């Protein structure tokens, strides 16, 4: 997967726009949000996407994101916080409540480093965002070699990040996949981050300028003869 669209169930997205996203050339979708997430909205958005054969990931930020019928679940582990609630606390409570019913083969954990101090998710998780390049590289190595996480996700959350930081963090990984999300608003930015990231995540621009969002995916569309 080179490109994923991230959709917020708390935001309105017309059915026609969803259809365009499905046929854009993207490799799949993440459904996820920070606040005001209602199970009905998650269900409705998921149902709009099920016509596609592309993977649909539910990113579980709270219990409202859990749909038993989903094929893929992403579990965020925020690495750059000192509040254990976001590294394992909430996770343990959910497992305590639902452990025997969790479809573990459909669950993938992702190590998050959140770098936009003004983002809602940074405030919510008490993320320490004033990190050096060396800090971020260290988190990448921690994710891969200590926690053995399959995904390391650098999240600038609405702000376009530093390609050099992305390059350095990506170069530190061998087996863990590197995902980048944040502020991609053009096909040029998509191509720039895709040089280093295994997967780029495109979100906010969907709700600001759909055509520009579609362009970020078309550059990855498989060419046919």
UniProtKB/Swiss-Prot annotation:
EC numbers, comma separated: 2.5.1.n9
SUPFAM superfamilies according to UniProt: FMN-linked oxidoreductases
Residues holding Mg(2+): 8, 34
Keyword presence, Metal-binding: yes
Residue numbers binding sn-glycerol 1-phosphate: 6, 153-158, 183, 203-204
Enzyme class name: transferase
Pathway it works in: Membrane lipid metabolism; glycerophospholipid metabolism
Superkingdom classification of source: Bacteria
Keywords, in A-Z order: Lipid biosynthesis, Lipid metabolism, Magnesium, Metal-binding, Phospholipid biosynthesis, Phospholipid metabolism, Transferase
Database matches in InterPro entries: GGGP/HepGP_synthase_I, GGGP/HepGP_synthase_sf, GGGP_HepGP_synthase
GO MF: heptaprenylglyceryl phosphate synthase activity; magnesium ion binding; prenyltransferase activity
Catalytic activity: sn-glycerol 1-phosphate + all-trans-heptaprenyl diphosphate = 3-heptaprenyl-sn-glycero-1-phosphate + diphosphate
Cofactors that this protein relies on: Mg(2+)
Record Pfam families: PcrB (PF01884)
Coiled-coil residue spans: none
GO terms of biological process kind: glycerophospholipid biosynthetic process
Subunit and partners: Homodimer.
PANTHER family xref list: HEPTAPRENYLGLYCERYL PHOSPHATE SYNTHASE (PTHR40029:SF2), PTHR40029
Membership in a protein family: Belongs to the GGGP/HepGP synthase family. Group I subfamily.
Entry-linked HAMAP family: GGGP_HepGP_synthase (MF_00112)
Function: Prenyltransferase that catalyzes in vivo the transfer of the heptaprenyl moiety of heptaprenyl pyrophosphate (HepPP; 35 carbon atoms) to the C3 hydroxyl of sn-glycerol-1-phosphate (G1P), producing heptaprenylglyceryl phosphate (HepGP). This reaction is an ether-bond-formation step in the biosynthesis of archaea-type G1P-based membrane lipids found in Bacillales. To a much lesser extent, is also able to use geranylgeranyl diphosphate (GGPP; C20) as the prenyl donor.
The protein, known as: Heptaprenylglyceryl phosphate synthase
Annotated organism of origin: Listeria monocytogenes serovar 1/2a (strain ATCC BAA-679 / EGD-e)
């Amino acid at each position: 997967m080179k490109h994923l669209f991230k959709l917020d169930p708390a935001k309105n997205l017309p059915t026609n726009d969803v259809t365009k996203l499905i046929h854009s050339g993207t490799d799949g979708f993440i459904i996820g949000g920070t606040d005001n997430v209602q199970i009905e909205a998650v269900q409705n958005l998921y149902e709009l996407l099920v016509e596609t054969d592309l993977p649909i990931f539910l990113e579980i930020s709270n219990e409202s994101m859990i749909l038993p019928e989903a094929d893929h679940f992403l579990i965020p582990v925020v690495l750059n916080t000192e509040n254990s609630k976001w590294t394992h606390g909430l996770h343990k409570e959910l497992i305590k409540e639902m452990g025997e019913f969790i479809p573990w083969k459909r669950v993938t954990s992702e190590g998050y480093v959140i770098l936009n101090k003004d983002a809602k998710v940074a405030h919510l998780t008490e993320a320490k965002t004033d990190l050096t390049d060396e800090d971020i590289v260290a988190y990448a190595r921690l994710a891969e070699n200590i926690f053995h996480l399959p995904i390391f996700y650098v999240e600038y959350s609405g702000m376009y990040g530093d390609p050099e930081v992305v390059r350095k963090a990506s170069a530190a990984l061998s087996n863990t996949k590197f995902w980048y999300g944040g502020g991609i608003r053009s096909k040029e930015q998509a191509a720039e981050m895709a040089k280093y990231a295994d997967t780029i995540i495109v979100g906010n621009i969907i709700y600001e300028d759909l055509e520009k969002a579609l362009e970020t995916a078309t550059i990855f569309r498989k060419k046919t003869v």
